[in-house]
């Protein structure tokens, strides 16, 4: 399986969906990880750290989207000004996307429909509750 980590393009978004540590873990489990060059810079993770972790650094976000079976992002897919097309248009049928999509928000309904029409399987982190210990809700 090939995991893709593109650079976030939302204005002001400096986070990255995978750290060098998580990349090393994925590579150690036999996965191939593609990281767009500069993807971690806003979070103070530099390309050589990703290379040391076993990632393949990729210049072009389109290559990340074309080659990956699963895309990890922080924010929803947007229009990529530099490429002149939307990130969704770079995705392919059967590709998985894990990110924060906010599908219930009316402004995002069209985006969700566009991903479905493209055949992208999206998993949103919005509704996931993560606990490290039992809580009264368990």
Predicted features, each with a name:
Residues 122-127:
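Short, acidic/small-residue loops that bind anionic groups at enzyme active sites
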Residues 131-138:
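Conserved small/polar residues in nucleotide/adenosyl-binding loops
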Residues 2-114, 118-120:
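An N-terminal-biased, well-structured beta-alpha scaffold segment characteristic
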């Amino acid at each position: 399986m090939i995991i893709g980590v593109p650079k976030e393009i939302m204005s002001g978004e400096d986070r990255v969906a995978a750290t060098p540590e998580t990349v090393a873990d994925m590579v150690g489990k036999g996965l191939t990880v593609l990281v767009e060059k500069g993807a971690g810079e806003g979070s103070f993770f530099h390309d050589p750290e990703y290379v040391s972790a076993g990632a393949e650094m990729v210049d072009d976000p389109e290559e990340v989207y074309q080659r990956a079976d699963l895309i990890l992002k922080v924010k929803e897919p947007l229009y990529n000004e530099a490429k002149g097309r939307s990130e969704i248009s770079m995705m392919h049928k059967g590709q998985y996307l894990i990110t924060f999509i906010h599908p219930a928000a009316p402004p995002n309904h069209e985006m969700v429909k566009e991903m479905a029409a493209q055949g992208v399987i999206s998993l949103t982190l919005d509704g996931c509750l993560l606990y490290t210990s039992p809580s009264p809700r368990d």
